[in-house]
Amino acid sequence: MQFSKMHGLGNDFMVVDAVTQNVYFSPEMIRRLSDRHCGVGFDQLLVVEPPYDPELDFHYRIFNADGSEVAQCGNGARCFARFVRMKNLTNKRDIHVSTQTGRMVLTVTEDDSVRVNMGEPNFDPQQVLFRAARVEKTYIMRAAEQTVLCGVVSMGNPHCVIAVDSVDNAPVATLGPVLESHERFPERANIGFMQVLNRGHIRLRVYERGAGETQACGSGACAAVAVGISQGQLAEQVQVELTGGRLAISWRGPGHPLYMTGPATHIYDGFIHL
């Protein structure tokens, strides 16, 4: 099986063409491939499938390193867009794809950055898969014997965003996994720790559901900006500084889609016997 190794700001992926290749991945196989000592090593596996709808170009599937399938990965979406053009699966710059929960438009720019229409952020607890009686801008949670104030939003996957004074000292490794599997998130969640520098600039670290802390989380950056704007802390255009680099996020507010722009880097192509 042929594959490519790619990354988006250090969030790394194994990307596989299932349009011209016949492939199947069991959870056990994914866990084996994701091992950084005995396998390829990656945060997520991205699979390019033929479209389920003739109006679309491809179907986009995402698997975490633990073998679980998820509905969204923003950094992966950028790598997906560059991959299908690099492999001559399409020559379009505007690429329409379906995911487990919806549709996305991926636009490859002249400098090979990728702009992703992430859709409209959804703050409805039922859509976020968060146990709450009603929509709130800020929720109070008990976790790890402390009170946590957070915002929750779905970007196609569930996110919890916590404001911190400094991401350098944020309890990502301790509080992250506790909140990820908190009883109020029955399907688990991605946990973002956001430091607001000013209305147009934040720093962010994310503990990703099924993957742990990564160098960058695209949907997490989108979620943090959406929550920050909804709480009145941020402007419509925000630079998000992650461990692996920067993303540009823009959102005009309710009724409008949110856009993410950033790089996608090809590392190498490989072949593996399964």
From Swiss-Prot:
Keyword Transcription regulation: no
Annotated positions for site Important for dimerization: Y268
Coiled coil regions, renumbered to chain: none
Entry keywords, A to Z: Amino-acid biosynthesis, Cytoplasm, Isomerase, Lysine biosynthesis
Active site: C73, C217
Pfam families xref list: DAP_epimerase
UniProt cross-references to PROSITE patterns, sorted A to Z: DAP_EPIMERASE
Residues noted as binding substrate in the record, renumbered to the chain: N11, Q44, N64, G74, N75, N157, N190, E208, R209, G218, S219
A GO molecular-function descriptor: diaminopimelate epimerase activity
Residues under site feature: Could be important to modulate the pK values of the two catalytic cysteine residues: H159, E208
Pathway annotation from the record: Amino-acid biosynthesis; L-lysine biosynthesis via DAP pathway; DL-2,6-diaminopimelate from LL-2,6-diaminopimelate: step 1/1
GO cellular component: a single term: cytosol
Record field: catalytic activity: (2S,6S)-2,6-diaminopimelate = meso-2,6-diaminopimelate
EC number: 5.1.1.7
Main location: cytoplasm
GO biological process, alphabetically ordered: lysine biosynthetic process via diaminopimelate
Compartment annotation: Cytoplasm
General function of this protein: Catalyzes the stereoinversion of LL-2,6-diaminopimelate (L,L-DAP) to meso-diaminopimelate (meso-DAP), a precursor of L-lysine and an essential component of the bacterial peptidoglycan.
Family designation: Belongs to the diaminopimelate epimerase family.
Quaternary structure note: Homodimer.
The protein's name in its UniProt record: Diaminopimelate epimerase
Source species of the chain: Sodalis glossinidius (strain morsitans)
Gene: dapF
